[in-house]
Amino acid sequence: MPIGVPKVPFRSPGEGDTSWVDIYNRLYRERLFFLGQEVDTEISNQLISLMIYLSIEKDTKDLYLFINSPGGWVISGMAIYDTMQFVRPDVQTICMGLAASIASFILVGGEITKRIAFPHARVMIHQPASSFYEAQTGEFILEAEELLKLRETITRVYVQRTGKPIWVVSEDMERDVFMSATEAQAHGIVDLVAVQ
């Protein structure tokens, strides 16, 4: 039986009355975001708007993005990554379950030295995929070209942010590569493994 979204007390600075807000709004006010689902346009736009709003509100206080996601739409994930690079505050990324596919790309996009994985977290990288079987021949070729460009971009970002040679990243992206938190740290995707 679903419990819904819990309400928690919140008092704005300078106000005497406490109001009840849903837990996500309370966490947003503390600059904490959660990517706990498949990446799509809706969650991407929500996270982007929150990052931009809070960076305008106070551009010197870090933002924290907790990730437990199986991945999702590449372009939506790249939009989150680009926003993380664009906003002035550092964005700390924390993998707390699974960061797979484009979610691992978002994880690696956190501020270098501020990317963390919980001890039992898993990270998976691979090449971008598509649904070619639904396309006509002409569409198939155009989609293949676009997919190749996306793969090159993603590979370049992993190389830049992990410090690994391009041949290592390219080889790893050929198939699904699952890593433990310590393996992800050795691979340069995260900087720290949280202590139990």
Curated annotation (Swiss-Prot):
Protein EC: 3.4.21.92
CDD domains per record: S14_ClpP_2
InterPro entries found in the cross-reference section: ClpP (IPR001907), ClpP/crotonase-like_dom_sf (IPR029045), ClpP/TepA (IPR023562), ClpP_His_AS (IPR033135)
Species annotation: Capsella bursa-pastoris (Shepherd's purse)
Record note on quaternary structure: Component of the chloroplastic Clp protease core complex.
Gene3D superfamilies in the record: 2-enoyl-CoA Hydratase, Chain A, domain 1
Location in the cell: Plastid, Chloroplast stroma
Group of enzyme by EC: hydrolase
Function according to Swiss-Prot or TrEMBL: Cleaves peptides in various proteins in a process that requires ATP hydrolysis. Has a chymotrypsin-like activity. Plays a major role in the degradation of misfolded proteins.
SUPFAM superfamilies reported in the protein's UniProt record: ClpP/crotonase
Full protein name: ATP-dependent Clp protease proteolytic subunit
GO molecular function: ATP-dependent peptidase activity; ATPase binding; serine-type endopeptidase activity
Active site: S101, H126
Family to which this protein belongs: Belongs to the peptidase S14 family.
Reactions catalysed according to its record: Hydrolysis of proteins to small peptides in the presence of ATP and magnesium. alpha-casein is the usual test substrate. In the absence of ATP, only oligopeptides shorter than five residues are hydrolyzed (such as succinyl-Leu-Tyr-|-NHMec, and Leu-Tyr-Leu-|-Tyr-Trp, in which cleavage of the -Tyr-|-Leu- and -Tyr-|-Trp bonds also occurs)
Annotated PROSITE patterns: CLP_PROTEASE_HIS
GO cellular component: chloroplast stroma; endopeptidase Clp complex
Major site of localization recorded for this protein: plastid
Gene Ontology biological process terms from the UniProt entry: protein quality control for misfolded or incompletely synthesized proteins
Alphabetical keyword list: Chloroplast, Hydrolase, Plastid, Protease, Serine protease
Keyword flag Metal-binding: no
